[in-house]
Amino acid sequence: MKDKYVLTAESVTEGHPDKLCDTIADAVVDACLEHDPTAHVACEVMATAGKIIAAGEITAAWLPDIPAVICRTVREAGYGGSDYEVEVITHEQSPDIAGAVNSGAETGAGDQGIVYGYACDETPELLPLPVVLAHKLTRLLTQARKLRTIPSLKPDGKAQVSVEYQFGVPKRVSAVVVSCQHEDGVELAELRHAVMRHIIQPAFQDFPLDAETEILINPSGRFVEGGFEADTGLTGRKLMVDTYGGLVPHGGGALSGKDGTKVDRSGAYMARYIAKNIVAAGLAERCTVSLAYAIGRAKPVMVEVDAHGTGKYSDTALEQAVRTVFKLTPNGMIDTLGLDKPIFRKFCNYGHFTHADAPWEQMNMTEVLESACHAKETGISAR
């Protein structure tokens, strides 16, 4: 990598059409798990002007009123929940897949998949700075709308932050982009002033902008129509927003709309949990954890740890410690992280890894990891 480079990440508000589809899908998952912790759910949502479609596979002892869940979720995002025709198309999980997943004492992975977890020490959240700043902006947009700090704001919105690095250290913010839906008749200059005062300045208190930072607020001008009326929304289209802003590899599987037997979700959460504890323990400054699974198999077919040359121990020792310390089967990940509980909707906005109270964000394995790494490194050296 060059000595000097720029990294960029984006975020969206909970009223963004794609993210609202994710939220609806996770509300359906939660509604199923609330009554049946063993429910298998794969829910996709597509929405456009006047219509919302939820489709997928649900095998559960109790089925929720999905149209009611959808309308309630849309209302809570700031839109009219009764303004849409709702269509639900669901059926049970394929018996072939169910047989593969449930055939042994250990639940097998619901599909093959590759997932990545990442952590770095450049922010308190142990995430890349552009990711943290972009999510701060969209959180503040939603807060300003709900509290009516900026009364003209409507639910849809996006933000993007570019940070200049030198020798791997963030030095300055080179560009900030904020696009926010607003009521008709608002003067653009007034809106831009309000966003600068109530959104951008508070977001960058800890990492100030400079005179050369390019700040773009609603660069396209008028943004009155938003949400499903302006753009068709679909689950799984904000994968970089959900994870690490495109700054880390991604296996391609979406997080939302899936129960914990789907390793796209449980594996991604576990990989982040592992990486965060490695960095929190001081075992590395940066860490990428890679896991891969085969459908019907409980144990991963790949476990890789890359400390990017910053590790206190060798990557081999870190990998062996991870295999020893963490339960990497679907059952193990579900049990460790409480993924049989209705918790998913709470964490699906503003990135899945920015919520300090999420189970996969806890830094409670640092000491055992340190001990395991020391033992593994000693064993490697003795060979």
Protein language model annotation of sequence segments:
Residues 186-280:
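Glycine-rich anion/phosphate-binding loop at the beta-strand->alpha-helix junction
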Residues 48, 286, 293-383:
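Internal helix-turn-beta structural module
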Residues 6-13, 51-59, 115, 119-121, ...:
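Short glycine-rich or small-residue beta-strand-to-loop segments that form or flank ligand, phosphate
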Residues 42-61, 295-299:
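Short, charge-patterned binding micro-sites
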Residues 10-12, 16-21, 107-123, 224-248, ...:
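Conserved phosphate/anionic-ligand binding catalytic regions in large, soluble enzymes, centered on
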Residues 1-40, 375:
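N-terminal, positively charged regions that mediate nucleic acid binding
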Residues 8, 50, 68, 75, ...:
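Glycine-rich, mobile lid/loop segments that gate access to catalytic sites or pores
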Residues 39-43, 157-163, 213-217, 283-294:
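A short glycine-rich, hydrophobically flanked beta-strand micro-motif that places a catalytic Asp/Glu
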